[in-house]
Every structure is written in structure tokens, then in C-alpha cells.
Amino acid sequence: MRDVALVLSSGGARGLAHIGAIEELEAQGYRIRSIVGCSMGAIIGGMYAAGKLAEYKEWMQTIDKKKILSLLDITFSLDHLVKGEKIIEAMKDIVPDVKIEDLPIPFKAVATDWEKGQEVVFSKGSLYEAIRASISMPLFFDPVKKGGTTFVDGGILNPLPLNISKDMPGDIVVAVNVSGTGEDNENDNENDNENDNEKRKTKTKTKTKSKAQTALDFLSSLLPDEPDVNYFTMSQRLFRLMVQKNAALNIELYKPDILVNIPMDLFGPFEYDHVDKISTYGRKKMREALKNIDN
């Protein structure tokens, strides 16, 4: 049994792939000794460190498009569209808050100090305060203000915090990056059917927008300009490109022992109603990565 220091990237709903990656690690006898996560990686990592990943996944399996919208406390402020508190409170109903230092597995979450332009690592205090700071995507979530500091999404500076893992317990570093470059084909996923694949391909190619799709589609539909060029969709695209480049740089600087790289454009950042599809894909990619190491 090998001990793992696990690093989980930011990436919105794409981060649901982290669930399957963890499941495959455990299935193959790896023991996760520590976790550091950013944004969605902080959510999944925190749930696992609390021993509640299965409960979190079960809850996510109840999420549909209507429920996504019900969890978004939308407010058209100058610096954000969603307050973010309803999501956290809903998660607390499934997994109660706990102090990070009391978790059975060492855990750290990464956020960004907006004024200083520095990464901030949460290693103690409220688990949900750390998660809320780490997921505060600019222009989408209300920034977190605490102790005179304004916290925003850790993905701005450090979407794949490999540098933090060097001080965490574990014999090998395993990283899951859901903002990878390149292309992949969902037809490789044995649990997908042809109709699902064709629908996703069409959606990706045409970037069709409608209120019935995702929260991003809904928010975009409220803006007056063309959906592909309004300020919100453009800012999110810029943010995603920045995250992708920073993650690639971290991989180059701090090479993990095992890397799972999932192309950014394979899943949308707001497809939270596809937990089974995305987590299954993450499990498949982890299986492939472990097979390559074993060989």
C-alpha cells in the first residue's frame, strides 16, 4: 500500500472528476495521507478529509438544473452575481462544519489575497470558511472578507497547488488537473451512450445557450449582448485560460509522481447535474494513469 499526498485542482463542475479519481485510488490500494485542494478541489478534498465524500456524492446525485438555480442566491452587484451562502448552507446540511485541524486526514485549501496578490493556505479553522474563500470566483461569487483581508478563488494564482504538497504527508504526490490542455473523446467512457456523446459534442461546438441548460446559460441569458461576447462569458473564458496556463506551469515546476490530466473543454464548469458522468470519467483517467505507472 502506497501513501499518497493528493493535489486536487480548481475547475468548477469539472472537479467532480476528483470524486472518481479518489475512488479509483482507494480501489487500487493507495492510501490518501493528505490532501491539498483549490476551489472545487477544496470542496472534494475537504469532503474526503472529513470522511463524508460518499454522502456528498449522494447529495450531488440529487442535483438537477432546477436545483442548481435554487442554490444560487443571485444578486446583481458591481463585483459579483451570486452571494454563495445558500450553497454553503446546503452543504452543511449534508456534512456539518468542522475545524480543519480536527480532520482525520491533513487538509489544506488555497485561496487568493485579492489586495496583496498572494496565495493564502488555510490549514486550520472552519472547513467551510476555507472552502468558501477558495471557491470565490471573481465576478461570480461574492468575495470573502475576513480580518481585513479580501479572499477570492485560489485558482487565480495557484489552481493546482503542487508546491503545497511537498510539506504534506505521503510517499508519492498524485495530482488531478481538470483544466488540462489537449483533447479527449468521451466515447472512451464505457458508461456513456452515443446519444449523450452527440448531444455534448453539439453543445461544445455550437455553444448553444438557453435557460434550461446550466446556471451559466441562465446568467448569460439575462445579459443584453450576444451570449458568446457579453462581459460575463468573456470574463469566465479569460479566467479559465489563466487557470489552464498556471496549472501547466505548476506541473512543469513541481512534477508530481502521478498526474491525471483532464482536458478543460471536455466538460463545462457549470455541469453540476452530471456528477455520475464526470466522476466516472475521472475514475477512468486515474485508472489509466496508475496503469502507466505500474507498467
Predicted regions and their residues:
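Catalytic nucleophile loop
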Residues: 18, 32-49, 158
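ATP/pyrophosphate-binding catalytic subdomain of soluble kinases
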Residues: 125-126, 132-170
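Non-catalytic peripheral regions of patatin-like phospholipases
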Residues: 4, 53-90, 112-114, 118-124, ...
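A short alpha-helix-loop-beta-strand transition element characteristic
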Residues: 68, 95-106
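Conserved small-residue
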Residues: 11, 21, 41, 109, ...
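Helix-rich "cap/lid" substructures immediately adjacent to catalytic or cofactor-binding pockets
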Residues: 1-35
